[in-house]
């Protein structure tokens, strides 16, 4: 599976309280969550994000409270994948479980800028920076995780099994 999109870049330790603030956790409506995604760190995110865009961040993305709402809000906002140097483990698991592709690749994060255009191949882990004509090698998903992503998350995977 390949995705192509424009980059929104963030720093270290972007926590789940910033991704979707606790004041919005009283809803499970995905569109409502998406409308507040990243608003405490990037007020214009929801106005500028387009389907297929990509979040790139430094280390420890998704740290903080364990809430499935965070990857749901990101995915519902139209983000096709998140690339970071490292992820908080619970965010990593929650993302895979809801079908949000995420890749760790420190080299890519160091070289990608806000607004760059990327193409990502999840089967190989290759990240192409089309703006800079560069390529980085991320870690490809193991086959079973790729199947979960391909089925839009763990529930879809089990339903289709």
Swiss-Prot record:
Keyword tRNA processing in the entry? The reply is no
Please state the pathway this protein functions in, per its UniProt record: Amino-acid biosynthesis; L-leucine biosynthesis; L-leucine from 3-methyl-2-oxobutanoate: step 2/4
What sort of enzyme, by top EC class, is this?
Answer: lyase
Q: Which domain of life is it from?
A: Bacteria
Q: What is this protein called?
A: 3-isopropylmalate dehydratase small subunit
Name of the coding gene: leuD
HAMAP family registered for this protein in UniProt? LeuD_type2
Physiological role: Catalyzes the isomerization between 2-isopropylmalate and 3-isopropylmalate, via the formation of 2-isopropylmaleate.
Q: Which family does it belong to?
A: Belongs to the LeuD family. LeuD type 2 subfamily.
Reaction catalyzed: (2R,3S)-3-isopropylmalate = (2S)-2-isopropylmalate
| Record Pfam families | Aconitase_C
GO biological process terms on file: L-leucine biosynthetic process
Matching Gene3D superfamilies: Aconitase, domain 4 (3.20.19.10)
Q: Which InterPro entries match?
A: Aconitase/3IPM_dehydase_swvl, AconitaseA/IPMdHydase_ssu_swvl, IPMI_Swivel, LeuD, LeuD/DmdB_bac, LeuD_type2/HacB/DmdB
């Amino acid at each position: 599976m390949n995705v192509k999109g424009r980059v929104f870049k963030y720093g270290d330790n972007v926590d789940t309280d910033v991704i979707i603030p606790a004041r919005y956790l009283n809803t499970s409506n995905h569109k409502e969550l998406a409308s507040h995604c990243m608003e405490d760190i990037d007020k214009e995110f929801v106005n500028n994000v387009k389907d297929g865009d990509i979040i790139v961040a430094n280390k420890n993305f998704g740290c903080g409270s364990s809430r499935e709402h965070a990857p749901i809000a990101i995915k519902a906002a139209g983000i096709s994948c998140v690339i970071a140097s490292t992820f908080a483990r619970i965010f990593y698991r929650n993302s895979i479980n809801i079908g949000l592709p995420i890749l760790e690749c420190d080299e890519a994060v160091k070289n990608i800028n806000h607004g760059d255009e990327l193409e990502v191949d999840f089967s190989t882990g290759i990240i192409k920076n089309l703006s800079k004509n560069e390529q980085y090698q991320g870690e490809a998903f193991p086959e079973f995780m790729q199947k979960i992503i391909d089925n839009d998350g763990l529930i879809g995977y089990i339903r289709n099994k």
